[in-house]
Amino acid sequence: MDKAVLHDHLDGGLRAQTAKELAVKDSYKPLIEVENIEKFFNRESSESLEDYLEAFVHTTALMSSYDNLERIAFEAAEDMHMCGVTLYESRYAPLYSVNNDLNVEDVINAINSGFNQAENIYGIKSGLILCGMRNDKQNVSLVSEIAIDYKDKIIGFDIAGPEYNYLPSLFSSEFNNLSENGINLT
C-alpha cells in the first residue's frame, strides 16, 4: 500500500549515526560528546513543545553546508521510502542554514538535490515546505518572501516553533500575500 507523509520535519528526522558523523566532520562538540545519541534525540517523553524542540538546535547546527543538507534530505526521503512512503512532504526553516558559505538558494537547491537523488533511485516524490519561525515576525516575513521568490522549487509555506503567544492570526498579512501568489499554506 502506498503511503504519504505530509508535514514531516527535515531537521527532526536526522539519523542518529548521520548526526554523529556530521558532528565529528564539522567539529560540533555538543553532539560529539553525547554518549548515547539515539537516546539524546528521542524526545517522545518531552513535557512541552519547547523541550521537544530543543534537539532541533543541534540538528540545525549540522545543516550548515550544501553537502550536509543534500545528504540529510536524501536520507530522509530514503528512510520514508523504506517505510513504504511514495509521497513525502518535508518542512524546514531555511534561514537556519544560511551562513557566509551558503545562501538561501543554495539551501533550497541542496535539499531538492537530495530529494531528486532519492527519487531517481527509489521513485519517491518529495517536496519542500519552507517554514518561518513564528516567534520571530521578521523571520516569517522574510521566509514568506523567499517562498514567493522560489515558488517553483517548493510546495508550500508554514510557520513553526513555539505556539504559545504566537497565534497564526499574527501573520495574516504574510498568509494573504502568499495565497495571492499561489503558495500553498499548511
Across the structure, where does each feature detected by a protein language model lie?
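Metal-cofactor-binding active-site regions of metalloenzymes
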Residues: 1-183
